[in-house]
Amino acid sequence: MGPDRKEVPLSRGTQAVVVGKGRGAPGDDSSMGGRPSSPLDKQQRQHLRGQVDTLLRNFLPCYRGQLAASVLRQISRELGPQEPTGSQLLRSKKLPRVREHRGPLTQLRGHPPRWQPIFCVLRGDGRLEWFSHKEEYENGGHCLGSTALTGYTLLTSQREYLRLLDALCPESLGDHTQEEPDSLLEVPVSFPLFLQHPFRRHLCFSAATREAQHAWRLALQGGIRLQGIVLQRSQAPAARAFLDAVRLYRQHQGHFGDDDVTLGSDAEVLTAVLMREQLPALRAQTLPGLRGAGRARAWAWTELLDAVHAAVLAGASAGLCAFQPEKDELLASLEKTIRPDVDQLLRQRARVAGRLRTDIRGPLESCLRREVDPQLPRVVQTLLRTVEASLEAVRTLLAQGMDRLSHRLRQSPSGTRLRREVYSFGEMPWDLALMQTCYREAERSRGRLGQLAAPFGFLGMQSLVFGAQDLAQQLMADAVATFLQLADQCLTTALNCDQAAQRLERVRGRVLKKFKSDSGLAQRRFIRGWGLCIFLPFVLSQLEPGCKKELPEFEGDVLAVGSQALTTEGIYEDVIRGCLLQRIDQELKKTLGANDVSCTLDGCLEVPWEQEGAAPNLNLVSSFLAGRQAFTDFLCLPAKSSANWILAASLLSCSCFRSGFHRDSRVFLVQLAEGLSHSLETVSSHSVWSFRPTPRQ
């Protein structure tokens, strides 16, 4: 435990948490077991608020320092040399919200709990809501319950879920009572959907058919991934600073291993940090006092955890909201003060880094040779297999999609079926069923890589897999956007179908070449970034006792600069990061034969998801420009046809590809508010899109 931190005295009052009695949380009827209106008494809630205040008091100084360092990093990158090999594909800068999914399910809920029909909705922001029936949802009624999907794990095996539940309270297995709702859980559920969270109550759903279960599984997994990596995907200085501050704060508490604690929003991350710190003491104090046995006690435990989590999350959210004005003012001030002095700051940083590198070279090289070098080749190769297989699956799907368009253009001059193909092609990055092939490839090496990384304290496999999956989706989105842009530029109304198909085939070749270049660059970034995540905390922990003792003698040089953007600890970590990255690059050259693998300082500072121009906000429409309207003119759409909206949607890829179109592009004048379902209905009935047939046609 860190300084000023006390154990949470929550043992008193936990006798009241009894499965099958009491009431659930207001507005959330999701728990299988019941609980009193508040499992925590006033004193316990006050104590938790004190714990959150202590966390913020210790964390915010780290955050302020990292904000300054992040602004310096951003300015130096803007002013420094650019990468010789940049992205070839056009950037689809902002990924969309998850597709909304809705339908009937049954849920284990109520007091006493029983399986009851509900109407469930996965919102575009990844939030899950459930209603008493469909009409309640359609009429804008209040939901029975809702939850953000951050941190949940989805299980579709009832046996696996029961084993997980039993593991929560293993000491009480076999002690069954009439209170325990085992009969409800052990009645076979044909198509279950169990959502489990380490600090929150579990959600038990069941679908009516295997097809419905499969569709919900894909949708829920997409929502979990979307909400989990919102910070990692952002390139805003504040997001990068926050993640670095969390890592430094935990290192100061003695935790050096990387794990999945940084999944979620900033408030959710801080909540997870505090919950992990307090969980052992909380478990020791409260479990003996919980009534019930077996799974009844396990459910009571999740109820209590949920109450603690809610209290901590509320406090963390309030604290970060209160800090927001100061953060905005600090960022503006840092920009004004750092930019004029950036050259001086970087020169001083380089001088201190050179001296530090000389001082720690001996123990650092010894640690790398002894601990890192023997495992590095296997880690790099496994990381490469993980991302390479996923991106190869993306390439295959992309090529098939472009081939279908060319084939349809040759075979269907009426345009109705072609219009469907254009729409489907634009939707590929967000088609969960289609992209599942790529996502599965990212999962295949999880076990092997986890075994290799665990000795170094790395437990963030879920974050790593999410990163590979997100990379696959981003590259697919970029490639689709590029193809549609180039098609816009090369097609004219003077072409017949065969000529147009030939031009699309040439575009296909160009896009695949660009994709090959970008996927190679993305693989190297992925391996370098995650290699650092695996090895850097371990090396820092190994050097902690000796090398950090040398840092105070450099404080004078750093303080003389008079900027909080430079700290001896930050420069020290950058030196170690740079040496590690040299090792990783050498191994990459052996594995890939990549002569252009660079080891610039900017590269050393990169994190796994960092990509040029990546969007800080996942829920905004992309700013990808439309280019010319020749593609749409070639398809001969009347200006006010409902099919115009279809093409707009296909190029937008569910309203997420582009928004900054030419003002005279008539295709995009139709308001997107018409709705996706209406547009799909007009596809099959609209017969306009006529083409000039070739002579043989």
Curated annotation (Swiss-Prot):
<dbReference type="InterPro" id="IPR026088">
    <property type="entry name" value="Niban-like"/>
</dbReference>
<dbReference type="InterPro" id="IPR011993">
    <property type="entry name" value="PH-like_dom_sf"/>
</dbReference>
<dbReference type="InterPro" id="IPR001849">
    <property type="entry name" value="PH_domain"/>
</dbReference>
<protein>
    <recommendedName>
        <fullName>Protein Niban 3</fullName>
    </recommendedName>
</protein>
<feature type="region of interest" description="Disordered">
    <location>
        <begin position="1"/>
        <end position="48"/>
    </location>
</feature>
<comment type="similarity">
    <text>Belongs to the Niban family.</text>
</comment>
